[in-house]
Amino acid sequence: LRVGGLGPSDDEAVGPLSQEGESLTTLGERLGFAPTDWVRLQRIHGDAFLPWLHRVARAPKDLRLRLLGGNDIAYTKLARRWWRPIAATRVGHAMQHRPVYFVSSNLHAIPNLLSGYVQRRRQLLSDFLARHEAAPDGPTGDEVQALRSLEPHANPENSLYYASRLWHQAHREQSLRDVRRAEEAERGITQIDASTGFDVGAQVIELAALHGSDLDPRLAPYAHILAASDAIILNVDYPLGLASYHIVREVMTSCDDVRGVYAIGKAATLNAAIGDVLLSSEVFDEHSGNRYAFPNAFRAKDVSKFLTIASALDNQTAVTVRGTFLQNQASLGRYYGERFTVVEMEAGPILSAVYEATRPDRHPSGERIVFRDVPMDFGIIHYASDTPYSQARTLGSRGLSVEGIDATYAAALAVLERILLTERSRISGERGEEEHAP
């Protein structure tokens, strides 16, 4: 297999082309790379990019993949190994019998909203932005400029969170990451690094250990709920495909009282714009062939109140694909013709796991399944990262950068507000039962 059309005859070309940056751009064009993908490849390899190109050019390549443990039992074992370090934490021991809210999301938005880590460094981050704004040619100059141009229209807290991301990119010392983890741990947020083949990290968040004064201002009205709650949030780092099915299934098996299952993720949109929020009430799952209809816990009004730039679209219909690389204009056109508007990679398998947690049998294949009464709160929120009809690129490969902060934090806020409101109702109900007990 000749990678990108680069063969032995091109080895000589890499040498002179590497002498100046604009010649590297020419090489990317000759190899058929889109400019953004070529820059992305350079960033991945860093200083090793040119030596890597020389190695690629030296001889034709024969690439082979071997799938290890690709059966249901092996996946189940993998999910149990993934769960063990979570169960071994102090709070993890208690998760079996306490209320648990499962969230599939990234690992930065929810801690930022709950821990106060970023707010406590407001002046530091302001000074950081000012320095890099004065030096636009620096490594983060473009993103700082983009953030500054967005600030008049963005929520100031969201801008601060993005500034924190840029600051940590510029300061990668382990000691700084340790400080952040220590502060979060003091507030009941325990980080569990990915350690198995799933490569999925997690956070165990104990609501009662959070400090009400640290909450994002938009969550401040719910601060009084924290101390009275014994609930735990399990935030898991974007499990995709069948990994999401096996992880949700393992959580349901290990925890007796799962009160909510929520998924926040990127998706391709066939009818909206980059950064818009998409709320589906029906999902076709390519893995099982099932078409799931369900009452999504979130409507446009639940998310739009936290949006300042993007739009929220509900009543969408999603398709869970097996892999983003496999999608092309023909398949996307077929889906759009069947009135699908969202293309993503996790909702279908999660729904299959929810089916098995609420029905006496394993999920079927090729059927239409309607969830009318689910014994737990369930919601899915996507935000558009790709518009494949107008941009020919692998789905999910595009980093949202500044464009994504509005939707990312609106989705996270909607989920956290939902959890806190659910906890308020649960606690009030339990108190009412105690008052009326004989």
Model-based region annotation:
Residues 1-438:
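Accessory terminal and edge-of-domain segments that mediate assembly/interaction
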